[in-house]
Amino acid sequence: MGKTSKAKQSKILRQGSKKAETLSKKISPNTKNLPDHHFKLVKVKRGLDGLGLFAGEDIKKGEIIIEYIGTILNKEEAEKVTTSMYLFEVNRNKTIDGSVRWNIARYANHACDPEGNAESDIKKGRVFIKAIKNIKEGDEILYDYGEEFVKEYIAPKGCRCRAVKHDYGAKGHVSK
């Protein structure tokens, strides 16, 4: 395959975001009372820990960046999934399996406070990644995955975020 120009990549990502937004409306219940969101341009490239999600434009504090989308699972279905690292528990009875290719929000990496610049925001059964700080174009989008996930999956290997202090007992912190 040949190289794709930056302009074409941007166009693809914008189309991908629109496609993902449309697909999320089809598979996410309880969305009729939510306004349509115009998501920010984001890029996937090598980041802090593997692939990462990066701002393709300046993003202001409080703006919704992207929606975390995927297959909606009930509690029993989610408990049977053993191969996905992209499960996002919305509530006790609903989980989103974000391992689908068109969910580029899954590339937002973890950061311990205060290094994160985004947070998850759950509204009417949908999960959005929202800026908690101004984010400049080119900055990696990072948020705290939460204590349970960090203790189970990140702490045993050592957290690789840039934070000086890790509240979840992460060991083997790798400084950048």
Annotate each predicted stretch with a short phrase.
Residues 2-12, 17, 112, 117-176:
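C-terminal SET catalytic tail plus cysteine-rich post-SET Zn-binding segment of SAM-dependent SET-domain
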Residues 13-119, 174-175:
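Catalytic cores of histone-lysine modification enzymes
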